[in-house]
Amino acid sequence: MERGGYGGGSGQGYNNFAVPPPNYQQMPNKTGNYNEPPPNYGKQGGGYDSGSGHRGSGGSGNGGGGGGSWNDRGGNSYGNGGASKDSYNKGHGGYSGGGGGGGGGGGGGSGGNDMITQEDTIFVSGMDPSTTEQDIETHFGAIGIIKKDKRTMKPKIWLYKNKETGASKGEATVTYDDTNAAQSAIEWFDGRDFNGNAIKVSLAQRQNNWNKGGGGGGGGGGRGGFGGRRGGGGGGGGGGGGGGRFDRGGGGGGGRYDRGGGGGGGGGGGNVQPRDGDWKCNSCNNTNFAWRNECNRCKTPKGDDEGSSGGGGGGGYGGGGGGGGYDRGNDRGSGGGGYHNRDRGGNSQGGGGGGGGGGGYSRFNDNNGGGRGGRGGGGGNRRDGGPMRNDGGMRSRPY
């Protein structure tokens, strides 16, 4: 038998060759089942086939575990992505012949919950809930000039309220004309009494939305098995890479017996959750608070399009791999699935493996986008499966 998936050489993962081989006198002799998945190039890969006919262990780190298989059914494969987001790729092998290997683990997303300190803005907490914006302006305006909003010409004071009840939380931000006034406000008002409450005053912070790169692309689907009455089903599609802040995608579709493997999934979501109602400017890609009616950067009025999510890949039927998802909000799609059986799979029932997921990208910095996922494996090529044609060849992108 051929052992299941294996990963890179360093780290915690290793190939365990201490498992005794199966007793070939106690199980049927299947010939031609060379179901060896392609190597995973991620670090700390692991996983092996114990010879029990079940799935190989999932690899740790960046590489996904390979699908171990013998007899009639291919094993499952679980691949964990690295960094801040886990990709979950599960590739089912085919029935009635050799099973397809699972897809490799997707790459992790870059970026994190980085916070930027606003040197000209203070955050005030612990106030009495009955405090109004006028009270705040009078009290904190005594130490320096409060900045005016250019559109409304009102002081830049934001009073935080409960979204359900509309009641004040006793917290607010105040933006001054210069940073020295903000520092002076902290020194003068922090810990002091305001309307009967001792308040806390510090520099305000906000999320860093401008340098978040997308996650890496998912691994390619496994190769379909040889032999049997029909060609083995194609491996499952690779998992999608991490997307930007508002991009979320589905996982790759698994293969099905004597059918084509599923397409690669859409990009995984970033780890920064937008607030309810936040919207993205169609002109400069700036993310604005829900209460703004125009972009605070380029002054473009608020539009209806706030970005869309990448769709998941569909499972293939009749030999063809399913199509990958796409992002409706822009021109960057996720990885497509395998083409029809004439291009990627067998001529008859041996379906092609799904393509890897497209790499995510940052809406705010296009240079930090993730890499494209791996290619899907070919279909089975014995008897009804038919020979493969143009397997693994490059094709023009549909976007």
Swiss-Prot record:
Domain of life: Eukaryota
Low complexity compositional bias, start-end: 387-399
Limits of the RRM domain: 120-206
GO molecular function: chromatin binding; mRNA binding; RNA binding; transcription coregulator activity; zinc ion binding
Extent of Gly residues compositional bias: 1-12, 43-69, 212-271, 308-339, 347-361, 368-380
Keyword entries, A-Z: Metal-binding, Nucleus, RNA-binding, Zinc, Zinc-finger
Tissue: Ubiquitous. Enriched in the brain and central nervous system during embryogenesis. Enriched in the adult head. Embryos contain both isoforms A and B, whereas later in development (heads and torsos) only isoform B is detected.
Renumbered zinc finger spans (RanBP2-type): 275-304
Keyword Metal-binding belongs to the record: yes
UniProt feature, compositional bias: Polar residues: 24-34
Subcellular locations according to the entry: Nucleus
GO cellular component: catalytic step 2 spliceosome; nucleoplasm; nucleus; transcription factor TFIID complex
Region Disordered, annotated ranges: 1-82, 209-276, 300-399
Protein's job: May participate in a function common to the expression of most genes transcribed by RNA polymerase II.
Family note: Belongs to the RRM TET family.
Protein name: RNA-binding protein cabeza
Source organism: Drosophila melanogaster (Fruit fly)
Gene this chain is encoded by: caz
